[in-house]
From Swiss-Prot:
Belongs to the class-II aminoacyl-tRNA synthetase family. One of its GO terms (molecular function) is RNA binding. This is Histidine--tRNA ligase. One of its GO terms (biological process) is histidyl-tRNA aminoacylation. It is found in: Cytoplasm. Its EC number is 6.1.1.21. It catalyses: tRNA(His) + L-histidine + ATP = L-histidyl-tRNA(His) + AMP + diphosphate + H(+). HAMAP family: His_tRNA_synth (MF_00127). Keywords: Aminoacyl-tRNA synthetase, ATP-binding, Cytoplasm, Ligase, Nucleotide-binding, Protein biosynthesis. The gene is hisS. The lineage of its organism: Archaea, Thermoproteota, Thermoprotei, Desulfurococcales, Desulfurococcaceae. GO terms for cellular component: cytosol. It is an enzyme of class 6 (ligase).
Length: 435
């Protein structure tokens, strides 16, 4: 603090009411989309045993990005959730009686020891939807369709859905370059958006690959376009490879269902986490360029690491933090709404406060959000506070209102003032509210 105002740690944020109102509105839209596909809500602890997360994400995440700590009493190591997928896998393994396929959505905070920058924080909310128990392309198609519908519901213009398949790349690399372990290559390629083409080239060279091999990799990952065209080209060149053939058949069936002009096949897409095994996807905005706003894919081996048997799974994570940042920058979202209150009961005469209190109770029971003076301020001050917060309807209570059993309602936006009996006040307020 050092003499200044107290503030949260670097990479962590406070969300004042106007921000939380926007966040809640957007998250409720996502919940509606998830539930429209029949996904059920789930929550898991913010803290997991370290051994639950260890060995699931890859070296960089586990050595640098996961927040972990030791219990000073038991000596056992714990970690904050790095994502919502590994906890899901642990949950499924812990509950073997779940009906399959198990479709869940989970909206919750995760923590990563990232270097804070635009669109990247150390504490943020993920919005995940996953299908556990189906190995078929239909499940992956539903995930792609859900991702498209989610971004549409959030009102963002100009986005693309990039898809690929880990097996497709593995098979092409196997045929072209003889790789039997492409994971180090994937990790280098995954940095393309962060470090650019030349940066990836240098990363590949650091792996000790010959220059000709590096150039061939760079050429392969430049293949992108309409899925049908790219897949047909790959089938002609590498269709004899078993991994390529499996991936092509799966992708073609998946994309025949999830048919959207915004979907493209991009061979540079690998997704950095080690647990992906098949189709993968990312959603990127045309503007602003802030990285992916959603991503996911198939991870058929992860649940089995806990359950001791193969259980297929696929899913997507929507990055609400980047979406909000992008929407504010584009002007799609605003922070104009400062309060959830729809009505301010303005008490003009303290002698009739009990009547004002009863009026507020009736309005609340009618489903309205109501504020009433709690600081014994003058009527003028109450009006000023309500105006500053942007509360759309004022309900005045003075001697004539209390003695006559009515309220005087006023809407500045509509320029309308009306006196209504207390029993009709709810409907009258609803008519005055902005549509």
């Amino acid at each position: 603090m050092a003499g200044g105002r107290p503030r949260p740690p670097r990479g962590f944020r406070d969300f004042p009411p106007e921000v939380m109102i926007l966040r809640k509105r957007l998250l409720s839209r996502l919940e509606r989309v998830f539930e429209s596909y029949g996904f059920d809500p789930l929550d898991t602890p913010a803290v997991e045993y370290w051994e639950t997360l260890s060995g699931k994400y890859g070296e960089e995440a586990e050595s640098r990005l996961i927040w972990r700590f030791q219990d000073p009493w038991s000596g056992r190591w714990y970690a904050l959730r790095y994502d919502l997928t590994v906890p899901l896998a642990r949950f499924v393994a812990s509950n073997p009686g779940l009906p399959m396929p198990f479709k869940r959505y989970h909206i919750g905070k995760v923590w990563r020891h990232e270097e804070p920058q635009k669109g990247r924080y150390r504490e943020f909310v993920q919005c995940d939807a996953d299908i556990v128990g189906s190995p078929y392309p239909e499940a992956d198609a539903e995930i792609v369709s859900l991702a498209v519908d989610s971004i549409d519901a959030l009102g963002l213009p100009g986005f693309r859905v990039r898809v690929n398949d880990r097996r497709l790349l593995a098979g092409v690399f196997e045929e072209e370059l003889g790789f039997d372990n492409p994971l180090p290559i994937y990790r280098a390629i995954d940095k393309l958006d962060k470090i650019g083409v030349e940066g990836v080239r240098r990363e590949l060279e650091r792996l000790g690959l010959p220059g000709s091999t590096v150039e061939r990799i760079m050429e392969i990952i430049s293949w992108r376009g309409r899925p049908g065209e790219v897949l047909e080209s790959v089938r002609r060149g590498y269709g004899s490879n078993e991994k390529v053939r499996e991936a092509l058949d799966h992708l073609e069936e998946m994309l025949s269902l999830a048919d959207d002009k915004r979907v493209e096949l991009d061979m540079s897409l690998v997704r950095g986490l080690d647990y992906y095994t098949g189709p993968i996807l990312e959603v990127v905005l045309d503007e602003p360029r802030i990285g992916s706003v959603a991503g996911g894919g198939r991870y058929d081996g992860l649940v089995g690491m806990f359950a001791g048997r193969d259980i297929p799974a696929t899913g997507v994570s929507i990055g609400i933090e980047r979406i909000i940042d992008a929407g504010l920058e584009l002007g799609v979202y605003s922070l104009d709404v400062k309060t959830v209150a729809q009505v301010a009961v303005v008490v003009l005469d303290r002698r009739y406060y009990r009547y004002a209190w009863e009026a507020a109770r009736i309005l609340r029971r009618g489903g309205l959000n109501v504020r009433i003076d709690l600081s014994r301020a003058s009527g003028q001050v109450q009006r000023r506070k309500a105006s500053r917060l942007g509360i759309p309807v004022l309900a005045f209570v003075g001697a004539k209102e209390a003695e006559g059993g009515f309220l005087t309602l006023y809407s500045a936006a509509k320029g309308e003032r009306v006196a209504v009996p207390l029993g009709e006040a709810v409907k009258a307020v609803e008519r005055l509210l902005p549509s």
